[in-house]
């Protein structure tokens, strides 16, 4: 890390997806449900500084193919695509925070709001083209997320930073 304390791009991992296997989930804004799914994945999405559309492509492929659902033998061998489950994407910039030091998160590693909004919208558009059903939260809104975590099963997915 440079003396400035701000990581350079190749020291920052790519986009983040905190995924939870759910039996149902919804997201609300001002008390109104704006997105809901039944069995599937709730994915909280963090965008880091320097992330590009390629990172969104890689993350989406992992969201759709990561094997977290049980097969007939109870083993996690099935993906969201395999079961035809729902995908609820919720933007959460705090996932991109630097929490390595102190007692307060730093956000120098998070993408600027306009950049993050653009990449989240791109991820959502790509998800809707590749899979159904897809629902989403609203970037920058104060949201309330409700879910029934199945298992519980929760994973932290990161795309790797592109090679320089």
For the regions a protein language model found, what residue spans apply to each?
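Short Lys/Arg-rich amphipathic alpha-helical segments
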Residues: 11-136, 150, 154-155, 159-164
């Amino acid at each position: 890390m440079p003396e400035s304390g701000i990581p350079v791009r190749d020291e920052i991992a790519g986009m983040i997806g905190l995924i939870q296997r759910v039996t149902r989930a919804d997201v609300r804004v001002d008390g109104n449900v704006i997105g809901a799914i039944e069995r599937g994945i709730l994915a909280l999405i963090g965008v880091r500084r320097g992330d590009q559309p390629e990172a969104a492509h890689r993350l989406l492929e992992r969201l759709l193919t990561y094997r977290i659902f049980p097969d007939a033998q109870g083993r996690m061998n099935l993906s969201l695509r395999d079961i035809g489950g729902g995908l609820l994407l919720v933007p959460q910039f705090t996932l991109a925070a630097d929490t390595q030091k102190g007692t307060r998160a730093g956000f120098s590693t998070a993408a600027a709001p306009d950049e993050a909004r653009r990449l989240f919208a791109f991820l959502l558009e790509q998800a809707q083209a590749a899979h159904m059903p897809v629902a989403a939260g609203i970037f920058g809104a104060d949201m309330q997320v409700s879910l029934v975590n199945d298992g519980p099963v929760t994973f932290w997915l990161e795309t790797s930073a592109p090679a320089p």
